Amino acid sequence: LQHWERWGFHRGKHYLIGIKPPKKLGWPEPVIPPSNWENTISFYNGSIGTIISQDRKGTSNSLSLDYLDIDEAKFINFEQLKDETFPANRGNVNLFGRHYYHHGMLITSDMPVTKKGSWFLNYKKDCDQQLIDAISSLVVEEYDIRNRIKTSGHISLYAKRRLKEIGLHLAQLRSKALFYKEYSSVYNIEVLGMDFIKQMKRDLPALTFQTSIMCKRPS
């Protein structure tokens, strides 16, 4: 949540946790309001997120979800996840099916050190690098066109048509893509600072530093 604050999303103004948004905020109603707001993150645009815990069985069985955000994946029970939560990622195709992220997943974690916690590493073999490269190429082209428009203050008919084509291509490719990447904390050096990396190397056990900070698989 501190990152949301840093990015300009403030609690009580842009999102709330565990309570129904008061009408005085003027936020739109969710398409499907939750029956219980206790485990709900609500946003100022009317969207909501449901916080799911694996402490109890069946907490996601009755849900119809549009997207999954799985944090600290190395601590997740994969058997419970695939039996309960994956099947719940099924809702509202008629409403949001045109969006390429619909029914997608974001999985983030430190590098696991146990076999049980390594379930998500298997996605690496399903990452089609040629598809990812094609997406990257289109993104670069889109950026270049938009940058030229910004610099010149003029948008040609070709640029307008090409941006539309790129948008359609990207939506189609992204809807089929699985992106897998392992990043060390060095990639986030502008936020963390080099002193943090040095301190972690000094203070953490070697295995913890290699897996949690440098994102290296245990040998």
What is each residue range found by the language model?
Residues 1-219:
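Phosphate/NTP-binding elements of NTP-utilizing enzymes
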